[in-house]
């Protein structure tokens, strides 16, 4: 009886700690089940009158306890439990083998559906919404911002979540605060966590968002208010991984857990539904994939999507072709990023041949809420080649480029990226031609970068924040502002400004000359050309 009670307590404790789903298609549960069958088999293989531990003498009169193997004998019950464990594990291994890519190559290739288009169909880029900063930079900005708030940093730290979302059409990374240590949790858990950090991925501005109702459920909670444990208790049979922290359009905090079902036995997991947990009160609701609220951004995780896109590129012509001849075998490039398009967030990565050469065959965009995947065919340089080209343009500064993002400016494919110093902060920006990647433009701001590109290529960039202007220069003057030479002049009595970096013509500009360009709301000319 004692052994039965011990095993029941042991099962409950290990389940509460490791939280495997009660689902036979989950390897977590299979290991959990087989492990406990082995433990029970060993326990019931000891004679009832045998102490499981025995005292042994060590040197110098010291004693220690060790397992009493002398009392171990495999009776029918103990041996049967061990046999059942072995059978279950063997069957799971057999099913796993049968559902592997060796036998199911076509099924692996068809796990995702990819629509192919030409680059002319690639969404036009709104440069005011391109997330130039990368995750590590956002983390540094957010952590430093919290460190400046002395009343918060003594009790809380920033979680390492930093989920990228699209909020009101703009890209942000958000992360909740978490208790600095168990003592801080004990002192503050009754009132909860009242703030989260929000970092603008375009400007780099950080803010601490105050919540009307504090979060009582988070990853830094203990016991039943831990997010994953709370969900597991309410949904014991569902397969899900670590839920993502998200906020809705009103800034309310939630945790979003994608529920998976295995394709063909123990094969590839695919999303089947979504569970949303209100972080303020613990209320949950499960949605089918076609009912997911529009504010939810991350239903299809990036790493799994990329893996399954690679299945498609690898196995579309069969297992042996992928292994030997590799004809038409493709794979995603190393690294990925995110784009905000409309109110959704899209996964972006390149596609190259299996030979992993220096050129891309195209680009992938995946709507992370709906799972729709589109491949845009375009022969171009890989992201790593573009990064190397950008870093080479400023090699004297030893800057490191962030992972590039493909943008469509006037139907031209370009990589845009930040250039970071040794401290991990973005100091300059680079624009690299995706086809002729030796063509690089570098500037201190994104606006200057785009202005340089427009002037160099005699283009008018599509941007709602600028308007065309032309006229005759009058009252020309110049001044140095924050290290930049700025030219001032009047047109019809109105003062306009333009930085020297915008055009090589500016040092030679004279009163009475005609010009044309584009001006922003701040009266700075974004492009400038002498007529």
Predicted regions span which residues?
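Soluble extracytoplasmic regions of secretory-pathway and membrane proteins
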Residues: 6-531
């Amino acid at each position: 009886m004692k052994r039965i009670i011990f095993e029941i307590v042991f099962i409950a404790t290990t389940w509460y700690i490791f939280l495997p789903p009660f689902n036979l298609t989950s390897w977590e549960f299979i290991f959990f089940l087989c492990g406990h069958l082995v433990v029970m088999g060993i326990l019931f293989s000891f004679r009832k009158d045998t102490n499981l531990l025995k005292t042994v003498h060590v040197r110098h009169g010291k004693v220690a306890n060790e397992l009493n193997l002398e009392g171990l004998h495999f009776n029918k019950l103990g041996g049967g439990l061990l046999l059942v464990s072995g059978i279950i594990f063997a069957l799971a291994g057999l099913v796993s083998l049968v559902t592997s890519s060796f036998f199911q190559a076509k099924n692996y290739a068809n796990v995702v559906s990819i629509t192919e288009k030409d680059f002319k169909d690639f969404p036009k880029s709104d440069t005011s919404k391109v997330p130039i900063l990368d995750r590590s930079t956002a983390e540094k900005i957010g952590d430093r911002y919290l460190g400046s708030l002395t009343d918060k940093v003594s009790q809380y730290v920033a979680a390492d979540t930093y989920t990228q979302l699209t909020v009101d059409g703009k890209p942000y990374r958000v992360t909740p605060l978490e208790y600095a240590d168990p003592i801080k949790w004990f002192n503050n858990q009754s009132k909860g966590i009242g703030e989260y950090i929000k970092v603008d991925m375009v400007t780099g501005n950080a803010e601490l968002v105050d919540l009307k109702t504090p979060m009582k459920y988070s990853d830094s909670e203990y016991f039943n208010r831990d997010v994953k444990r709370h969900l597991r208790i309410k949904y014991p049979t569902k397969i899900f991984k670590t839920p993502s922290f998200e906020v809705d359009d009103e800034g309310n905090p939630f945790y979003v857990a994608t529920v998976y079902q295995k394709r063909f036995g123990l094969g590839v997991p695919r999303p089947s539904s979504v569970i949303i947990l209100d972080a303020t009160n613990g209320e949950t609701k499960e949605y089918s994939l076609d009912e997911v609220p529009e504010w939810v951004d991350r239903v299809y995780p990036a790493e799994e999507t990329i893996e399954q896109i690679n299945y498609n590129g690898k196995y579309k012509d069969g297992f042996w072709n992928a292994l030997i001849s590799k004809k038409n075998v493709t794979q995603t490039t190393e690294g990925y990023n995110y784009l905000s398009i409309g109110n959704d967030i899209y996964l972006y990565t390149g596609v190259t041949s299996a030979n992993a050469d220096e050129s891309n065959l195209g680009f992938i965009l995946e709507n992370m809420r709906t799972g729709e995947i589109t491949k845009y065919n375009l022969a171009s340089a890989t992201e790593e080649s573009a990064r190397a080209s950008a870093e080479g343009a400023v090699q004297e500064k030893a800057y490191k480029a962030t992972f590039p993002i493909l943008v469509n400016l006037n139907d031209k494919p370009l990589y845009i990226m930040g250039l970071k110093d040794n401290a991990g902060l973005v100091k300059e920006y680079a624009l690299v031609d995706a086809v002729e990647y030796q063509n690089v433009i570098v500037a201190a701001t994104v606006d200057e970068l785009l202005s340089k590109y427009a002037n160099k290529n005699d283009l008018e960039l599509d941007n709602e924040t600028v308007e065309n202007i032309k006229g005759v220069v009058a009252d020309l003057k110049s001044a140095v502002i924050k290290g930049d030479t700025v030219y001032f002049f009047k047109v019809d009595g109105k003062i306009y400004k333009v930085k020297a970096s915008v055009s090589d013509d500016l040092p030679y500009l004279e009163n009475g000359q005609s010009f044309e360009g584009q001006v922003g709301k701040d009266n700075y000319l974004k492009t400038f050309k002498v007529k």
